[in-house]
């Protein structure tokens, strides 16, 4: 029987979402899996320009945009292009945004397990495999596509267990509660000393393209500041940070 792991409540998300943003003319948000990357980009921009940029983190991108829909200070969203396309009512067209780069789907495994590739998930000693919820996390969508295209969905069956976010999947693998899990490169690199290993999956799913897009109701007084931050994201100054977090241009 599949294990359905509880997602964080939207109410808890809301309490985090609008904290500490009152003075900022740019307020950026992202899903749980890329909080550290976005925070690093914001910190670098603040240091280089002395400009104010606020952040609004908490929950998956769907939960966050549900709060944006109800009104709030967020005016720039960073996530994968496929997820952002679902929010055409809240966000401007993707063409108005900035492509940050591509990031691969990763399979990571716990200590005590050895995999030579993702096809080894079908090995007898792999009893439990975790993946993020495909309705809430892009890497869940990518994992679903990969499992289907490779035929592993039928082979693994009920060995696949669902969590709500990439960080949750990673924590289960680190603790050994799951033998393997589908995550992103940020999570895998950040926990490389706590797991058995990881490998990038190159084919079998739609590419994950990280993108920054303004909200549709961007206020006129905030436009110049948001565009300046987006210009930084598109510049070479952001590239080393993106590469560090597994986003490749």
Segments and roles (model prediction):
Residues 8-18:
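Bacterial N-terminal signal peptides
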Residues 18-24:
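Sec/Tat signal peptide C-region and signal peptidase I cleavage site
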């Amino acid at each position: 029987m599949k294990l359905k792991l509880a997602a964080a409540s939207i109410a808890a998300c809301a309490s985090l979402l609008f904290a500490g943003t009152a003075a900022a003319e740019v307020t950026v948000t992202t899903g749980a899996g890329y909080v550290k990357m976005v925070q690093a980009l914001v910190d670098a921009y603040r240091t280089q320009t002395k400009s104010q940029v606020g952040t609004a983190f908490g929950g998956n991108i769907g939960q966050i945009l549900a709060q944006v829909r109800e009104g709030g200070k967020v005016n720039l969203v960073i996530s994968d292009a496929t997820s952002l396309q679902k929010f055409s009512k809240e966000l401007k067209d993707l063409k108005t945004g900035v492509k940050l780069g591509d990031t691969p789907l990763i399979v990571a495994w716990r200590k005590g397990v050895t995999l030579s590739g993702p096809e080894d998930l079908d090995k007898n000693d792999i009893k439990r495999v975790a993946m993020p919820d495909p309705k809430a996390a892009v890497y869940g969508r990518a994992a679903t596509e990969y499992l289907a295209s490779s035929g592993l969905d039928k082979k693994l069956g009920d060995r696949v267990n669902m969590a709500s976010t990439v960080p949750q999947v990673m924590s289960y693998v680190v603790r050994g509660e799951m033998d393997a899990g589908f995550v992103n490169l940020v999570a895998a690199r950040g926990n490389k000393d706590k797991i058995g290993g990881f490998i990038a999956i190159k084919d079998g799913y739609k590419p994950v393209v990280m993108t920054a897009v303004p909200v549709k109701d961007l206020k006129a007084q905030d436009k110049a500041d948001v565009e300046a931050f987006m210009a930084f994201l598109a510049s070479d100054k952001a590239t080393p940070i993106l590469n560090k977090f597994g986003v490749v241009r």
